[in-house]
Amino acid sequence: MFESVNLDENSPEDRELAKVLSPPGSYLSPASLDSGSSFTNSGTSTSCFEPKNNLPSLSFLNARAGSLGGIFNHKQMTSPSNSNIGGENVESTTSSNDGSNENAGHPTTSEQDQNADHPTISQADDNGHSSLTPNPAVTSTVTDKKGNTVKRKYSRNGCSECKRRRMKCDETKPTCWQCARLNRQCVYVLNPKNKKRRTSNAQRVKEFRKHSTSLDNDHNNARKRQHSSCKAEKKKKVRQNLSEDTTDPKPITDNGKNVPLDEIESLEIPNLDLTTTMNGYDVNLLMQNLNDMVNMKLHDSYLLNEELKGLDLPDLDIPELLPASNVNSSVPISFLVNNVITFNTKLSSFKLGGIHDKYLKIFYYDCLDSIAPFFQNQGNPLRDILLSFAKNEAYLLSSILATGASIAYRKSNNLEDERNYCAYLSHCLSLLGEQFKNESNVLNRIEPIILTVIMLAWDCIYSMNSQWRSHLKGVTDLFKKINAGNSSKVLNVAKCWFKVMETFASISTVFGGSLIDNNDLDAIFDPYDYQYVDSLKFLNIMTPLNEFNLLRGHKEDFDLVIKEVFKSLNTIRSTEKNYFSKEEGLFTKKLDYLLLSSQTSSEKSKDQISYFNTQKILVEIDKQLDYEFIDKSGIIPSDNQSHPRISNIHDNAIDMVTLKNGEEVAISWYDISHQTQVLSFLLIVLLKLLGMPKESSTIQQVVKKIMSFFKFLDSDSPPQNSRTCYSNFAVLIAGLNAMDEETRAIVKRYYKINGGKFQKLTEHNLNRLEKVWYGKNQNYRLEEQDVLTW
């Protein structure tokens, strides 16, 4: 049985399949479990990503990699625009002078960026002398537009330590270069007399982000406070708070491991000024989307449940939840006020009482386990972010409870659950109307608002409602504006979650996802967005060695394939509109949408899709199929060092299965998830872009290759978990194209074992398969096919 799981790589079928893919060449080599890794951007390899905090390792590969602190360096990235301020060009020059001037020992502009995140701890005496001093021959000069040397401005706002030692301070926050070099405590005291000196916009934003948590110490007062739209008053208030914030920073700890705050460079707030990034249109559109989505869900609920119309909604008394006063195991990963995320949030930390606890428990386990199955029974960063914000934002908590009630209703069909679901949504709607009349309030709550929108959209998908696309316009516009270099960790996690929905919507539904424009796809599906990758690695959502995305179930640079396939599919969809009857809403081609190719849909689409571009997609798919996380066959050899019997590591990445013949095998979910998703895209390319018939041997080889990963289901006790969700679409499209009964039998067994968690979706897809296999009731309605398979 073990032999049958692996396809013979030297078989004639595989050689024929290889002809469809790219010719042999110089491909990206798959990262190995034991190899070092570095993030490459535009051909430049950097040894970045090394967070100084000690977050618990959440994945199998992280456990193999050891301490995260020794693998990657998480440093703050600043936008390139900050290097040119006020028309002055900052350049680094080399001088033979040994440095008797005031700049001796001071780092260059480029060195400041590096050294600020890599402080060198050295032994120094009271006079500041150290054996590890920077090269005094390197100086930094400032020139005007004509190239003339301009005298430096006096450092009036330097830290107190540099002033005490009468040394020039580079004013780097939170720790200047001198204090970092000498391991001194760096404290900034704002001098009101220097207020008239104008600082750069980037510096003001950085100061605001660094100390903004002091603005809202009292959460109840913060809710009632009306934000002023005047920037001058806002800056004045920030400065007043900064003048009082001179106490020593308390250490932030996680799981008992002390990490001094002044040593955590990765907690530096991202370089983002929302007042310049977002405008009134963005704010109004985002709030309108959220309002429309809540109203849509209420309308659908009343439409489907006539009994609710005569019932009054219950008056839900949701208690106010204040953030925990203890800062232990909390890390600020947002650029806004009071946004501190508590890791490993326990369900017991919420004391809601009554029916609220029931729905919160359903959300905590059922919903989040289906959204992020690789984090099941482990620390879940997405859960921590949602629940940390929910303690401060009542509208987000209401939407969380509404999602729990929605799941409970689908399980029990109890009208009381649906009634409470509507009540939570109404409560959420009223809170939104109260809190966000002022535009500045929206700006200060932009992250929880986006999380609320995405979560309600997810519930639409979960309930097989296809009206969610139009309500994500505000979110997609924001993601386009907040991209590489100026985002926050929370927004990057939200973007990652959004990309999960967008990926499966674009390949599994009739109308595709919410992104239509090619530029939008390039901006959002960018695997080389360094801050996005950096954020996910910091939160253990992406493994540091192989960059396996635990929230999306594949290697991150698979986005190179995803966005190009989406562009071609959008081209096909734009020409398929002629095949939809506006009056009847029927699909005029008597064929399942996933079987409709560009060759059978329209002559125009054949002309618009470039074969050479498709060939590039096939080359990249071949690279992706060559990646190996543990073993790309999906079955871990018994002598592999990652086998549980050798490594003694038990994780969601691996399951042990005893087959009916008595053989025990270890399966790698990382490889199964990645390989099946890549193969499903290969089928899309072959069927819909190249127009190959399903009867061809090439298509049948890919179909059998997909289903070969699930021969372990031939067991009396096969694994049942949500990690198969990443393979659901691959199994569906393989089943639709399967010609032999043996392969179809594996598809049926897959749905029988794994269909319990998505019962409604499973029944829907099995019905589609029956129509294709046996021609039963071939009435292909458009609305029946516009369902996201997840």
Curated annotation (Swiss-Prot):
Highest rank taxon of the organism: Eukaryota
Segments of skewed composition (Basic residues): 222-239
Localisation per UniProt entry: Nucleus
Gene3D superfamilies: Zn(2)-C6 fungal-type DNA-binding domain
Keyword NADP: no
Positions of region (Disordered): 1-50, 72-157, 195-258
SMART domains xrefs: GAL4 (SM00066)
DNA-binding region (UniProt annotation): 159-186
GO terms, biological process: lysine biosynthetic process; positive regulation of lysine biosynthetic process via alpha-aminoadipate and saccharopine; positive regulation of transcription by RNA polymerase II
CDD domains: GAL4
Keywords: Activator, Amino-acid biosynthesis, DNA-binding, Lysine biosynthesis, Metal-binding, Nucleus, Transcription, Transcription regulation, Zinc
Ranges of compositional bias, category Low complexity: 35-47
Keyword field contains Transmembrane: no
GO MF term (any one): sequence-specific DNA binding
InterPro entries: Fun_TF, Zn2-C6_fun-type_DNA-bd_sf, Zn2Cys6_DnaBD
Biased amino acid composition, Polar residues: 75-113, 120-142
Pfam families: Fungal_trans_2 (PF11951), Zn_clus (PF00172)
Its job: Activates the transcription of lysine biosynthesis genes. This activation is dependent on the inducer alpha-aminoadipate semialdehyde and repressed by lysine.
Misc note: Present with 450 molecules/cell in log phase SD medium.
This protein's name: Lysine biosynthesis regulatory protein LYS14
Organism of this sequence: Saccharomyces cerevisiae (strain ATCC 204508 / S288c) (Baker's yeast)
Gene name as annotated: LYS14
